[in-house]
A protein has these predicted regions:
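Hydrophobic alpha-helical transmembrane segments
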Residues: 7-11, 33, 55-59, 75-76, ...
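Hydrophobic transmembrane alpha-helices
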Residues: 1-53
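Interfacial aromatic-anchored transmembrane helix boundaries in multi-pass membrane proteins
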Residues: 22-31, 62-91
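Membrane-interface helix termini and inter-helical loops of multi-pass transporters
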Residues: 120-133
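Mid-bilayer segments of alpha-helical transmembrane spans in multi-pass integral membrane proteins
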Residues: 71, 106-122, 142-150
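Short helix-perturbing small/polar motifs within transmembrane alpha-helices
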Residues: 78-117
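Alpha-helical transmembrane segments and their cytosolic interface
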Residues: 134-172
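Membrane-helix interface "capping/anchor" motifs
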Residues: 45-56, 93-99
Length: 172
């Protein structure tokens, strides 16, 4: 893709990402959903533009969300997980299947625990008191991480098979 078109696509998707994160910051339930949808935009730029464009999108949305959003935790979720995950996924999937899967779990858990630690220390999140709730949260996170990784893969396939030709015809 030509640099001007890549810049245009990245800019529009950055604006949409910040808008989604803004809307997601109003309710505690919608923040993770907004982060996931915004991360799909990074995936789209990863597929279409390659190079430094996904990094620029990730950095610009992270910076703008920290500057503009009223709730800071959604910015932390995006910066530490949602925005960086499609880029990390691309590089980790160049490895063989089993090491790739294990490294994705390790990196995903490290990012999640770091985000949770920041939430506990700086954003006033509360930890449930019962040990079984903590264990259930970790198990649920593992399931969400695997499902999220699978959905990104399916989204890439869907984009390449069904929508990419239409998109390219639109931006000739």
């Amino acid at each position: 893709m030509k640099p001007v078109r890549a810049l245009t696509l990245s800019s529009v998707l950055a604006a949409l990402s910040v808008l989604l994160l803004f809307l997601g910051s109003f309710f505690d339930v919608t923040d993770l959903a907004a982060v996931i949808v915004a991360s799909f935009f990074v995936t789209l730029v990863m597929v279409e533009c390659r190079g430094a464009w996904p990094w620029l999108l990730y950095i610009s949305v992270s910076a703008l969300s920290f500057l503009l959003l009223p709730g800071r935790f959604v910015s932390v979720e995006y910066a530490l997980f949602g925005g960086i995950w499609p880029i990390l996924k691309y590089w980790l999937e160049k490895l063989p299947r089993l090491p790739s899967f294990l490294l994705k779990l390790l990196v995903g858990n490290a990012l999640a625990f770091f985000a949770a630690w920041l939430g506990l220390k700086f954003f006033g999140l509360e930890v449930p008191g019962a040990l079984w709730l903590r264990i259930a949260a970790v198990v649920l996170w593992e399931a969400v991480l695997i499902l999220y990784d699978f959905l990104i893969t399916r989204l890439i396939v869907l984009w390449c098979v069904k929508y990419r030709a239409r998109f390219r015809r639109l931006f000739r």
